[in-house]
């Protein structure tokens, strides 16, 4: 496949067409007149309704009612009708009065229709017509507060979606899993689609920290999650791990609106590693230490955590302007500035964003454009996170500073010759202050789409989108040569990057929608073509000491891959109660050889709206909607693997493989292992669901049960020595099975003028098992050790019939009288009289059995109190921090330094670390209150100026039996956690 088919010329042509249409249409529409419609919307009790959607029929132009139920909308001259809609109420379409500018409306409760529109792949669909497992969260239900990245908006809001933040740093990267992920070695990250442009799965950029955080959360209108094969198969080979569709805010058809919001916060540390306090440390050294170790005790009482952590300031400021620039040109322009200090000193990030959305339409909405431009600049300062380990384990009886200028004035472990001791812990404060690592990251995302409703073919719509996602990241690291942390290499002073990423997209599809009343049928057909091209480049750079001496090098890279796709979807509705969805996508990837390049990914789904049957009529006063769903589909996987794994590739040997010729070092090239038989990893899944709505749609309930089987896993497996240039090779090997249950319930419990109360809860159970890890089905599958390393040990394995990353440990034996673990004594599980690797056993996994979420909002007049909570039930974590700092041997690794001990030493009195003891495996179940917010809507404080304010606490509390810092980790092993802060913030918003 030619990776260069799509280039900027596609976008250039598309933008020229947009400009031509705009330019040609301006004269025709510039003279159009119109009028301003105003009014109030009330309910059956004649109370004002907040948030009623009002749309000019035949356009995407509209507005919503304010706190008093009032609205204002600029209506073009040729407009004939307005549509009023609200969840749980009948949608009303009313003719615009000719001789009046006022239109008041009374809404009526609707127990028959669920007309919400949900964004799906390559289009939209009525919620009542969905056959797949789809969940959507909008602006009003997003998590609030200091939100640095889009995924935080929906954490805990959607059943089956687990989001684990990488720690407390403002640049930390979240792990997102939908239904637990479907793979092992390949990517488990979901596909993210931003305004129709698929992002690179698991995308990253040098110096970028969290790549997704380069999108301003304040610009997001909704996030839709596609979970089952019926909804995801339209994305084919990138959909095995689910899809998240992000839609940004667009301009509305009302007066020009200006919105400004500022959030300012302070963040504090919550919990740090459970180490001995100074008094207990002194007592333990005096009790167990040698005379020399006792002599190393000082007279200070240094709390190293207080020295490295700080109260962190943050601010998030956003300004937007939206409305109608011209009668045919809705627009929204926004800018944002975000700054956040980390609670670890020297850690911070700044982000500046700009966003432009233009949505012009012409010829009575027959021709519509959507032009979006998003730009981001991020400036990051990365702290040396090794200071967290040092801050936990350094001797609390010594001072921070030495009193002289040696080694920057920091108190360090030095020998009799004044030389830093090899392997000794460097001063934690010195690590932070002497490590200067900064980065500059730029990102631009542009998209332009044209949507044409073909006038002479009823229901036919032609659509094309061009997208371009470009990013650049570079950074600089400086450490002075006197810094002990880099003493042996003479410090650091070098620049890396710039890495440049390119993502180009061309989408063309046709959609036909029509209702055939004579046969009680409706069809919606989409056929299309996609082409997407990615490129990543990084220049060669040298890693230098502070004096400019080369220490090592990093090779230049130029990576490219592309994906070509053809797809189609049929939605068929019969009698508004029997629903069919069939999808087919055929993908061709440049990551596979020609014989295996193309993959086909179909799906089919059926749904039955039982509540539309005549026999159900007596129940409709209570049960407003009942829908049964079933789907089956196949999705693919080719992300998370190398771009050229199927062809011979040579890699520079660089510093590790040089030869001397004529006294000069010559770099070598070595061949990489390759496999021309690589093919698609495929996932086959079934989904069974039910959707309910009752009591006039005030309560909704959904349940989904799914099974999933992933075959031909893309995995790196051992090879015989001397085979194919390497001992490891990427192959298609093994299967993984999973199943799960998801439950969601939402209730609009109270909705009156003075009071409203909404609540939602979700729960997800999942079970994942590895079924095979060999090329030959039925052959014995060897255990593969995986996960983080502690010293020379890994605690987790891939094993047949067990969950991925299951813990593989020795069974600790305990003293029957004291209940204390007996050092070095484990159960002889195979009964051979010896403790060997065969005595290790599979014991739990990091994955929780249940993931729960709950949120609620209570309003009294203009006051609103809201909160969100999350819980994990089951799942285990290996307390590596307790194990690795909880034995006497860790008290001192040399003759010049003492180290603090974890409080677990008081319970075990271990002399040696027990690396693989299940004593350190702890239940990681927890209950967290993520946020608690109190807000007040002042309404109009001066003519057209609206004011609202809120106060919030994030990371309010955690209830858990886990003894470490945080029970929530992405990999299940706690080696030294950057604690998540507790954040207090105040938000003030102005609208005019």
Residue ranges and their predicted role:
Residues 846-877:
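Glycine-rich, aromatic-lined ligand/substrate-binding cores of catalytic
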Residues 151, 155, 728-737, 777-807, ...:
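C-terminal extracellular loops and terminal segments
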Residues 127-129, 202, 234-236, 254-255, ...:
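Switch/connector loops and helix/strand junctions flanking conserved nucleotide-binding motifs
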Residues 259-299, 644, 748-846, 961:
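Conserved small-residue
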Residues 46, 69, 405-408, 418, ...:
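Detector for glycine-centered tight turns/loop "hinges" at secondary-structure junctions
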Residues 142, 189, 312-315, 351-352, ...:
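Extracellular/periplasmic, surface-exposed regions of secreted and cell-surface proteins
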Residues 1-363, 367-374, 445, 680, ...:
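Short, small/polar-rich motifs associated with maturation and membrane association
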């Amino acid at each position: 496949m030619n990776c260069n088919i799509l280039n900027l010329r596609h976008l250039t042509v598309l933008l020229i067409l947009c400009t031509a249409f705009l330019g040609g249409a301006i004269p025709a529409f510039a003279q159009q007149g119109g009028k301003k419609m105003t009014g109030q919307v009330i309910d059956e009790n004649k109370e004002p309704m907040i948030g009623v959607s009002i749309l000019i029929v035949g356009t995407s132009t509209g507005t919503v009612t304010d706190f008093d139920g009032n609205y204002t909308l600029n209506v073009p001259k040729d407009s004939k009708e307005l549509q009023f809609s609200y969840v749980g109420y009948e949608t009303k379409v009313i003719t615009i009065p000719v001789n009046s500018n006022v239109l008041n409306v009374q809404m009526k409760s609707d127990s028959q229709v669920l007309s919400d529109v949900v964004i799906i792949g390559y289009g939209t669909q009525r919620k009542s017509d969905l056959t797949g497992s789809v969940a959507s969260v909008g602006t009003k239900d997003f998590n609030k507060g200091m939100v640095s990245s889009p995924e935080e908006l929906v954490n805990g809001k959607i059943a089956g979606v687990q989001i684990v933040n990488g720690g407390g740093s403002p640049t930390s990267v979240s792990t997102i899993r939908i239904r637990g992920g479907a793979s092992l070695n390949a990517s488990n990250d979901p596909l993210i689609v931003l305004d129709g442009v698929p992002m690179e799965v698991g995308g990253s950029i040098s110096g970028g920290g969290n790549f997704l955080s380069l999108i301003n959360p304040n610009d997001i209108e909704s996030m839709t999650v596609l979970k089952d094969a019926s909804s995801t198969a339209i994305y084919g080979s990138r959909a095995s791990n689910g899809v998240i569709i992000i839609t940004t805010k667009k301009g509305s058809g009302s007066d020009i609106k200006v919105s400004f919001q500022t959030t300012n916060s302070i963040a504090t540390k919550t919990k740090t590693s459970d180490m001995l306090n100074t008094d207990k440390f002194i007592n333990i050294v005096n009790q167990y230490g040698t005379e020399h170790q006792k002599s190393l005790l000082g007279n200070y009482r240094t709390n190293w955590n207080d020295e490295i952590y700080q109260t962190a300031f943050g601010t998030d400021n956003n300004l937007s302007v939206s409305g109608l620039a011209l009668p045919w040109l809705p627009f929204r322009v926004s800018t944002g500035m975000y700054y956040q200090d980390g609670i670890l000193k020297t850690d911070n990030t700044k982000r500046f964003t700009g966003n432009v959305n233009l949505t012009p339409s012409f010829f009575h909405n027959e021709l519509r454009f959507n032009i979006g431009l998003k730009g981001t600049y991020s400036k990051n300062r990365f702290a040396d996170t090794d200071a967290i380990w040092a801050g936990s384990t350094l001797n609390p009886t010594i001072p921070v500073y030495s009193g002289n200028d040696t080694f920057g004035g920091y108190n360090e472990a030095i020998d009799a010759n004044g030389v830093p001791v090899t392997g000794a812990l460097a001063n934690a404060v010195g690590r932070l202050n002497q490590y200067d690592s900064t980065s500059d990251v730029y990102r631009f995302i542009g998209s332009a789409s044209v949507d044409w409703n073909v006038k002479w073919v009823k229901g036919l719509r032609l659509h094309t989108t061009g997208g371009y996602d470009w990013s650049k990241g570079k950074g600089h690291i400086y450490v002075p040569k006197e810094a002990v942390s880099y003493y042996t290499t003479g410090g650091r002073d070098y620049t890396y990057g710039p890495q440049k990423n390119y993502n180009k997209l061309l989408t063309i599809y046709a959609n036909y929608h029509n209702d055939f009343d004579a046969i009680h049928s409706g069809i919606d057909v989409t056929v299309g073509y996609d082409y997407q091209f990615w490129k990543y480049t990084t220049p060669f750079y040298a890693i230098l000491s502070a004096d400019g001496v080369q220490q090592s090098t990093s090779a230049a890279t130029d990576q490219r891959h592309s994906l070509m796709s053809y797809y189609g979807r049929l939605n068929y509705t019969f009698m508004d109660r029997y629903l069919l969805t069939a999808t087919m996508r055929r993908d061709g990837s440049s990551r596979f050889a020609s014989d295996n390049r193309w993959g086909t990914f179909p799906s089919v789904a059926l749904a039955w709206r039982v509540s539309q049957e005549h026999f159900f009529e007596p129940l409709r006063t209570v049960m407003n909607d009942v829908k049964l769903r079933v789907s089956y589909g196949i999705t693919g996987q080719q992300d998370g693997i190398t771009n050229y794994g199927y062809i011979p590739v040579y890699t520079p040997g660089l510093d590790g493989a040089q030869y001397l010729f004529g006294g000069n070092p010559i770099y070598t090239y070595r061949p990489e292992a390759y496999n021309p038989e690589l093919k698609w990893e495929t996932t086959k899944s079934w989904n069974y669901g039910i959707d309910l709505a009752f009591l006039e749609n005030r309560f909704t309930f959904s349940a989904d049960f799914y099974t999933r089987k992933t075959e031909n896993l893309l995995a790196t497996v051992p090879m015989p020595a001397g085979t194919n240039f390497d001992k490891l090779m990427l192959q298609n090997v093994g299967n993984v099975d999973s199943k799960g249950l998801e439950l969601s319930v939402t209730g609009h419990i109270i909705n009156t003028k003075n009071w409203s109360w909404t609540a939602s809860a979700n729960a997800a159970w999942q079970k994942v098992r590895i079924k095979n890890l060999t090329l030959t089905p039925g052959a014995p599958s060897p255990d593969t050790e995986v996960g983080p390393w502690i010293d020379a040990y890994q605690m987790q394995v891939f094993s047949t019939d067990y969950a991925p990353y299951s813990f593989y440990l020795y069974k600790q034996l305990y003293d029957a009288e004291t209940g204390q673990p007996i050092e070095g004594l484990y159960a002889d599980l195979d009964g051979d009289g010896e403790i060997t690797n065969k005595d290790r056993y599979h014991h739990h996994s990091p994955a929780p059995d249940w993931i729960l979420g709950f949120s609620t909002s209570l309003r009294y007049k203009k006051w609103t109190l809201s909160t969100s909570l999350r819980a994990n039930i089951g799942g285990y974590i290996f307390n590596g921090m307790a194990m690795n700092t909880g034995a006497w041997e860790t008290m001192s690794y040399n003759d010049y330094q003492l180290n603090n001990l974890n409080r677990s030493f008081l319970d075990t009195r271990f002399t040696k670390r027990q690396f693989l003891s299940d004593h350190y495996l702890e239940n990681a179940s927890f209950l967290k209150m993520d946020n608690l917010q109190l807000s007040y809507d002042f309404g109009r404080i001066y003519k057209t100026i609206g004011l609202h304010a809120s106060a919030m606490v994030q990371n309010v509390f955690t209830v858990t039996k886990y003894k470490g810092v945080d029970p929530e980790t992405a990999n299940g092993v706690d080696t030294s956690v950057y604690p998540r802060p507790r954040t207090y913030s105040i938000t003030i918003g102005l609208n005019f």
